[in-house]
Amino acid sequence: MPSELAELVEFLHHGNSQIRQIACENLLGFSISQPSLFKVHQLLPVRDLKLLVRDYTPIAKNALTILINLSGDEEVLKELAEDDAFLETLLSKVTVIISNSPPLPTGTAQQNKKEPHVNEITMLLTNLAKSDSFKRIINLTRSVPKDVSGSPKALDQLMDCFIKGQDGGINKAADSNYDYLAYVFADLSKYDEGRAYFLTRQEYDSVIPITKLTVFTEHRSHIRRKGVASTLKNIAFEVQAHPQLLAESGVNILPYLLLPVAGPEEFTDEESAAMLPDLQFLPPDKERDSDKDIIATHLETLLLLTTTREGRELMRAVNVYPIIRECHLHVDDEGTREGCDRLVQVLMRDEEGEANGGEDAALAKAKAEFEKGAADEDEQIVEVF
């Protein structure tokens, strides 16, 4: 059997497309159970698979799926993530209208269609973003895909795909929705350059990128909600940006963090009167986010935003406490309750005599706690079974 599998791997670069297709189909399951098969001859099978991403549709789909599964391996990840030409292949397929097949003979009509494997490509980009080398995409420029974006910046183009492509808005093929790009943004926001991008108004559309993402904290897609929640938390580590994040004329982040945490509970008129308008008189069928981890992430972001005295005073002024109190009472999860407790302790404490130096200590403590949890998230690789 091992010799037969080795022979099958050799067929990945066979000149006959039918043989390449059969090889991909039969090797797919082994990309999880026996990934070492693809690491022979200095990763030659991986290099073959990179080329097959541009092959006929059924071959390309299986090649992408195999690469998704293999990219959890550090050596394979390095091979994929550091390849500029391969990154451009993925970007051009995910951002523009292209042909899904190799060119037909001269004189043969060929109908261009939308890329049918958007979901697989964005899953692969999600895994590539685990590599530090992938952050070069933050400053990468390329040709403008006019059907999708008006910017030459690759990250702007991915943002536009994410915004316009939800629910098949750009690409109806195979229910393409670009949801997995939320995880790409979350990984990029861990870098200083990434946070700077999300907080800087972009020239091509005069919009601050993070304001495009906040609206997805209550989206029906769990992937979007989770990725955006992590992105917002990472952005909140930029303490100097807290005034911009909190201001109604800026990002106005508070409602987007509090709404997923809020449930259908009723508050007294006195409590409601001081709350943000979006949090007042919520309907009786209002539901909290169904994922306790996402709620915990929003609580961590809120805690980070209490690093400055101005942030704490704003949260007190808009009566955040009752919302957190009800979350503590109604979410049956120890981690969520601990997050509520930490936030309430900060909001309810006496500010008298507090020195500004305490803010640095609070941020350092928060970073230590959150980065410990983030280390586990970093190891999570998307796999397709």
What are these model-predicted stretches?
Residues 7-9, 45-52, 89-94, 154-162, ...:
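Buried hydrophobic core positions in alpha-solenoid tandem helical repeats
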Residues 1-51, 56, 251, 260-264, ...:
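N-terminal "cap/leader" segments of large eukaryotic alpha-helical scaffolds
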